[in-house]
Amino acid sequence: MAAKDVVFGDSARTKMVEGVNILANAVKTTLGPKGRNVVIERSFGGPTITKDGVSVAKEIELKDKLQNMGAQMVKEVASKTADIAGDGTTTATVLAQSIVREGMKYVVSGHNPMDLKRGIDKAVTAAIAELAKISKPCTTTKEIAQVGSISANSDHSIGQRIAEAMEKVGKEGVITVEDGKSLEDELEVVEGMQFDRGYLSPYFINQPEKQVAVLESPYVLLFDKKIANIRDLLPVLEQVAKSGRPLLIIAEDVEGEALATLVVNNIRGIIKTCAVKAPGFGDRRKAMLEDIAILTGGTVIAEEIGLTLEKATLEHLGQAKRIEVGKENTIIIDGAGDAKAIEARVKNIRVQIEEATSDYDKEKLQERVAKLAGGVAVIRVGAATEVEMKEKKARVDDALHATRAAVEEGIVPGGGVALIRAMQGIKGLKGDNADQDAGISIVLRAMQEPLRTIVSNAGEDAGVVVNAVQASTGNNGYNAATGEYGDLVAQGVIDPTKVTKTALVNAASVAGLLLTTDCAISEAPKDESGAGGMPDMGGMGGMGGMGGMM
């Protein structure tokens, strides 16, 4: 086992705080609409340019072991905040640095670190309660776009794309981010339920220019076995033909005589039909057929429930407004299923997601929820170079998480103002002793720091702006993008409540751990002088006479 260096008290804390400051100073340059870029060297390829706080934090490893410990603890604040809320990493880092810096002054002057931490925790709890009071729901497309824009470093096109995607697929829908093929950002939305199975015969195509079969107001027959004999299908086909509506058949397979008869009837115009294979395999296929049945208001024809094809009636068939069947995909738009039944099914799948152990199962279940709840949207990020693409994609991911957080827990005024307003919940707070009171005052000071940093990055006087914002009320604050004071919510400068809360809680948690640290153990540096390498080879000089051996 390698030897360790053990450092106690102020010596340990001082070094760790140095590490905190190095990391936080690098990260906080990116905060706010006028935050600066950070250039990161790569061992191969060009450097990466980013304005994403967590990307900067992840790159920092310090040579000094104790400094690195401090830096890694604050890095944990950034990454944990990103995991939970998807944004607020830079705010969390700035808050942590401030709590550590102010707290260290009290620790050095002899205050009890444990009571300081208790005071910090009390203040944070009160601030969170105040934030909940300030918060208002985020419901409109405009507000969602504003949250996305702020999180994507004031890129309004990204916010707009995310808002459009959420509007189209709903809050439960799946939104994915992919590399684009052009310079512009693109949004592709798959409405309704899509599954990866296409028509079993090209003779079902009724729109040759698009190579698709489109069925308007069709019935949907769901069967969990193969259909080979047309006699089994005849009773239900006759009923559908009388109704004059088209029919989509989804079964394990349709082959032989049954498929040939369907094709002939389709070509002759007797009954407009299309047949596709059921999606998935094994148990997943049964579950997906059941999903389609609930979405369309039909029943899966299965022997397990005592139903056979011959006994099937129109009541057993699902219905939809429109179905498009391509070579490889089928899209069911506006199924006629009962909304409450769909909601219950979604809840049931959510329970399965929580209980699932493998990531693959979770992903597949999540897809099923999205298909039932609204649809799938793909945002394709456009950029001129690969470096720009990576940087932009990271910002789109951040913005997407932030908008989800906003929809989930509401919004507060941005620009550091929410924390200034939340100070109202702490001002009357008293601790059990003077040390706890000191902990409360540490948090009060720290809650000004994000605003100070935003203003400093914009090149203005932080002290003047902080005093002006504290003197104002409600949503009024300083808009660093325009350099003007005003109602920030009306101007679209808003943050998700969850992001601000998570940043404060995580920052206080790690800062409290640092302040109550009294011993740091790190690996001792290896003694280079002892490693002399190979013994002296001076005696080899006599080999000069070996020339005669040639």
UniProtKB/Swiss-Prot annotation:
It is found in: Cytoplasm. Keywords: ATP-binding, Chaperone, Cytoplasm, Isomerase, Nucleotide-binding. GO terms for biological process: protein refolding. It is an enzyme of class 5 (isomerase). SUPFAM superfamilies: GroEL apical domain-like (SSF52029), GroEL equatorial domain-like (SSF48592), GroEL-intermediate domain like (SSF54849). PROSITE patterns: CHAPERONINS_CPN60. It comes from the Bacteria. Pfam families: Cpn60_TCP1. GO terms for cellular component: cytoplasm. It catalyses: ATP + H2O + a folded polypeptide = ADP + phosphate + an unfolded polypeptide. Its EC number is 5.6.1.7. ATP binds at residues 30-33, 51, 87-91, 415, 479-481, 495. InterPro entries: Chaperonin_Cpn60_CS (IPR018370), Cpn60/GroEL (IPR001844), Cpn60/GroEL/TCP-1 (IPR002423), GroEL-like_apical_dom_sf (IPR027409), GROEL-like_equatorial_sf (IPR027413), TCP-1-like_intermed_sf (IPR027410). GO terms for molecular function: ATP binding; ATP-dependent protein folding chaperone; isomerase activity; unfolded protein binding. PANTHER family: 60 KDA HEAT SHOCK PROTEIN, MITOCHONDRIAL (PTHR45633). Forms a cylinder of 14 subunits composed of two heptameric rings stacked back-to-back. Interacts with the co-chaperonin GroES. Belongs to the chaperonin (HSP60) family. Together with its co-chaperonin GroES, plays an essential role in assisting protein folding. The GroEL-GroES system forms a nano-cage that allows encapsulation of the non-native substrate proteins and provides a physical environment optimized to promote and accelerate protein folding. HAMAP family: CH60. This is Chaperonin GroEL.
